[in-house]
């Protein structure tokens, strides 16, 4: 299953906490099944796109970073995979 996750840094995160966040990220590496990772140009967070059937791994990642940021994870489909259900809905 494909997911897009938006992460938002907690407001007013001190530089020392940003350093600790980067240390955690360096240690953990990319999330299991990560396809892409984009950072917001305004410096407030970013987005990851991943594919996984293991919700437990995603939960473990969210817990590891929860002191620094919040998450919104949404299941997504590629457009070509959505066309069949859309056509069925419209018929």
Annotated model-derived regions:
Residues 1-91:
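Conserved, structured core segments of small domains
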